[in-house]
């Protein structure tokens, strides 16, 4: 039975996170261990052994007749056929679901080929469908990147909203040494915080309340999406948290030019009106002048001096991989502490070679993050 979020006397919103393939399954396992609440988890894989160690509430072995539980062998076509073979099982797991996050590492077999089929089924069932996928590291090779790009292009046509995390950006997320293991945890945090934030928005009654209809208005049939959560404390915390929410170094998008944006500001009862205005104004300045803006505010006494800003932006004209304009870098708050969120998890099997030698438009943003303690 799905986990229900009460949003009113007669309304329950059911949210699921589905990890497809090895990378997607690993994301689900880490999210379960982190204590993410308000959602149910589903693991989908051709690899029976991987499913046996999954922490998901539901486990679906796809393509049993085709692969005999041995995996897809990095062949997206095998992944696609396996998901097609198991359509009924996937549909069953999605019953009574209102919103689904599909996570997969693009470039391999099961995730690349199977995730678009899972998305297609979800959309056919009328479920708000959001995908958070990763692109391979450069060292994983040209073929894997080509498969990833093809899988992402197919996903874009199957989902309501799509968030892309290029694994290559992980090395820019911090100036500290990143191990191969914790690199994936950093990427997972993008999805975890986005999922937790949305479930909290729907579940918790705020001073200015947001509900599932608001989330749907921004994310339904929206194409590329940006999901970010910024946290900061101390001097200038409102602007710092907002800046981090709109410019995660892990994402392939910024919110510039977005035509739909949901902004939620959370703080203690002591949060000042001026701080709320600063955070909202910074976000508004970056989106399209005529953007549909939905604003919410909540109180959380556990935050003390901290402020949290959640931003979901959609309605971009730019396509995945198209260069983004360079954003102006602002000085970080001297005493603030911030956690960069962002949108999504990673696949440990996904890694490919980036041959792009043009200047990275996020360089200035990376410098801001790397200055922080």
Tell me the role of every PLM-derived stretch.
Residues 1-373:
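Tubulin/FtsZ superfamily GTPase core signature
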């Amino acid at each position: 039975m799905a986990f229900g979020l009460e949003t009113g006397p007669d309304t329950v919103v059911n949210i699921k996170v589905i990890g497809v393939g090895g990378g997607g399954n690993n994301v689900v396992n880490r999210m379960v261990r982190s204590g993410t609440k308000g959602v149910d988890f589903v693991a989908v894989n051709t690899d029976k052994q991987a499913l046996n160690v999954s922490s998901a509430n539901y486990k679906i072995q796809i393509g049993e007749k085709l692969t005999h539980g041995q995996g897809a062998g990095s062949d997206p076509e095998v992944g696609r056929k396996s998901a097609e073979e198991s359509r009924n099982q996937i549909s069953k797991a999605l019953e009574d679901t209102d919103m689904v996050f599909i996570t997969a590492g693009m470039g391999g077999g099961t995730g690349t080929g199977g995730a678009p089929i899972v998305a297609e089924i979800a959309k056919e069932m009328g479920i708000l469908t959001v995908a958070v996928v990763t692109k391979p590291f450069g060292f994983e090779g040209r073929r894997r990147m080509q498969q990833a790009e093809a899988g992402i292009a197919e996903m874009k046509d199957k989902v309501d909203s799509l968030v892309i995390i290029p694994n290559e950006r992980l090395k820019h997320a911090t100036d500290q040494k990143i191990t191969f293991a914790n690199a994936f945890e950093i990427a997972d945090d993008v999805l975890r915080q986005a999922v937790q934030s949305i479930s909290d928005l729907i579940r918790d009654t705020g001073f200015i309340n947001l509900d599932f209809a608001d989330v749907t208005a921004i994310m339904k049939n929206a194409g590329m999406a940006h999901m970010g959560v910024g946290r900061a404390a101390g001097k200038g915390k409102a602007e710092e948290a907002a800046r981090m929410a709109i410019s995660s170094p892990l994402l392939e998008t910024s919110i510039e030019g977005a035509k739909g944006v949901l902004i939620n500001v959370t703080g203690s009862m002591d949060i000042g009106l001026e701080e709320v205005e600063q955070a909202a104004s910074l976000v508004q300045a970056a989106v399209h002048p005529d953007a549909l803006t939905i604003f919410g505010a909540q109180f959380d006494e556990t935050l003390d001096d901290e402020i949290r800003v959640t931003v979901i932006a959609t309605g971009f004209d730019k396509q995945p991989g198209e260069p983004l304009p360079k954003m102006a870098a602002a000085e970080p708050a001297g005493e603030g502490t911030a956690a960069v969120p962002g949108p999504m998890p990673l696949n440990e099997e996904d890694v490919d070679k980036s041959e792009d030698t043009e200047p990275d438009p996020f360089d200035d943003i990376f410098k801001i993050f790397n200055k922080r303690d």
